[in-house]
Amino acid sequence: MDKNIVALGLMSGTSMDGIDASIIRSDGDEYIDIIGNLYLKYDPELKKKIQEFTNKINSLEDLKSNVEEYKNLERKITIKHQEIISEIYKKFEIRANIIGFHGQTILHKPLQNFSIQMGNAELLSQLSKTDVVYQFRQNDIKNGGQGAPLTPIYHHNLKKKLNLKMPVLFLNIGGIANYTFSKNDYFCAKDAGP
C-alpha cells in the first residue's frame, strides 16, 4: 500500500460489558501508529436486554422466532457504536477512512458453521458517513476458522514487533477464551473454552 489510512476498529465481546474502540494510522503492512483507544460501557438497561436476548437464542430457529426483537435491539447496539465513534473522533480530533465493525456476538457455533453478531453495518455507515467492513467472524468460519480471524494476526505481528525469538503462546481470556501459538513465521489459533 502506498499511502497511510486511518482505520477505526470497534469490538464488543461476548462478556457484553461494552465497546472497545481503537483508531490507528497504517500502511496496511509495516507501518502502524496507534492514535488512541477508548472504551464505552454499556448502560445497565442495554446490557440486561442483550443478555436476556442472548440467553433465549440457542439456534437459528430461535432467532427467526424473535426477529422483531432482534431488529430493535440491533438498532440500539448500532447507535451505541455510533456514540463511541463520535467520542473517539472528538477526543483525538481525527476521522477514520474506514471502520471495522465487529458487532455484538449473540450466538457463536463455529462447529455448526455459523456465528451471529448484532449490528447493522449499513446503518452504522450512514450514521458515521464512513465505509464499514464487517462480518469478520462469519467469513472466518466460511474459510475453515473458528470465527476469530483478527486476534491471531495481531498476536503474530505483536511478537514480531517485540522481536521475540522464542515460540510464544498468547492467551486471550474473554467471554470465549482463545489462544494464538506463534513460532517463527508459523502461527495458529483456536478457541479454548467459554
Question: What are these model-predicted stretches?
Answer:
Residues M1-P194:
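Short acidic/glycine-rich loops and adjacent helix/strand connectors
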